[in-house]
From Swiss-Prot:
Main location: membrane
Protein's UniProt name: UPF0060 membrane protein Arth_4238
Pfam families: UPF0060 (PF02694)
PANTHER family according to UniProt: UPF0060 MEMBRANE PROTEIN YNFA (PTHR36116:SF1)
Alphabetical list of InterPro entries matching this protein: UPF0060 (IPR003844)
Length: 112
C-alpha cells in the first residue's frame, strides 16, 4: 500500500504543479485571461501540500524523487495539452529519471 500511496501522491503533485505552471504559462505567454494565472497559483499551492502527505518523512528525499516524476510528467502533459511530440532522447531521459525515483524512494534502507 505504501508504494501505491507514494505513486498516487506523486501523480497528484505532478498534476497540480505542472497544471498550475501550465495555467500561468497560458495567461502570460498565450494571452489567456488573468484568472487562468490565479487558478495556476492555487494549483501550485495544492502541489506544495501534496508533498507533505508522502509517507517518507524526509523533505529532501521526497522533493529529489519528485523531480524525476516532474520530468516525465511534464513531457506527458505537453503531449496531451500542447501536442508536443517527444523524441527518443526525451523518452530515454524520462525513463532514466523514473528509475532514479524508484531507487531513491524504494531502495531498502536501515531503519536507523
Amino acid at each position: 500500500m505504501t508504494i501505491a500511496k507514494t505513486i498516487l501522491l506523486f501523480v497528484l503533485a505532478a498534476a497540480a504543479e505542472i497544471g498550475g505552471a501550465w495555467l500561468v504559462w497560458q495567461a502570460v505567454r498565450e494571452g489567456k485571461e488573468w484568472w487562468w494565472a490565479g487558478l495556476g497559483v492555487l494549483a501550485l499551492g495544492v502541489y506544495g501540500f501534496a508533498a507533505t502527505l508522502q509517507p517518507d518523512a524526509h523533505f529532501g528525499r521526497i522533493l529529489a524523487a519528485y523531480g524525476g516524476v516532474f520530468v516525465a510528467g511534464s513531457l506527458a502533459w505537453g503531449m496531451v495539452f500542447d501536442g508536443f511530440r517527444p523524441d527518443r532522447w526525451d523518452i530515454i531521459g524520462s525513463v532514466i529519471c523514473l528509475l532514479g525515483v524508484a531507487v531513491i524512494m524504494f531502495a531498502p534502507r536501515n531503519a536507523g
